[in-house]
Amino acid sequence: MASYLRLRILFAMPSSKAVVRYKNEINRASHSLDIAEARIILSAIAQVPRNSEVSDRELYWVSAADVVSLGSGSTSVYQQMKTAAENLFNRYITLQNESSSGRTGKSVLKFRWIQAVQYEEGTGKIGIQFSARILPFISHIQSEFTHYHLCELEGFQNYNTVRLYSMIAQYKSTGKFFTTVAHLRVALELGDKYPAYAELKRR
């Protein structure tokens, strides 16, 4: 029998106008990011125009100040951004759907978040060029999308916390979040961690 998780949702009033917006499929995917990389990716997504087509040649700049404003330590932010610049090119997103071929099982699609990254030594600025595969999920969005103000992520120190908050934000209009524990395990890439449902709830 599947285990389910229900949460009642309360959101604080935002203090910034920068909005993260993407298709709901992103919430159901696994992401392979750490918290520093996530702050950079989400800061870049917040710059993508909502209602217009975007080329994969666009470069979105994220500064050290942007990352610090989301909760990164100011003394280590330059090293965090340099490390993130080295790692982001190899980070990917994995989408699982029912097989479209009529066969039983899942259809798994894996692609990179970005196709290029540029790091400016001494300035702590990173330029992000999103991959062509991710663009349909983060640009020209008209329906079935999740959105929240970037500043709502301030102080989160663990990427799974960001992920869970993002999943909940999808249902902010209803005030209730409902999912299976099995889905959380896949989306948060928990594997065999916290095998007991009660332990997962505590975490």
Model-derived regions, located:
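Charged, alpha-helix-forming regions
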Residues: 2-203
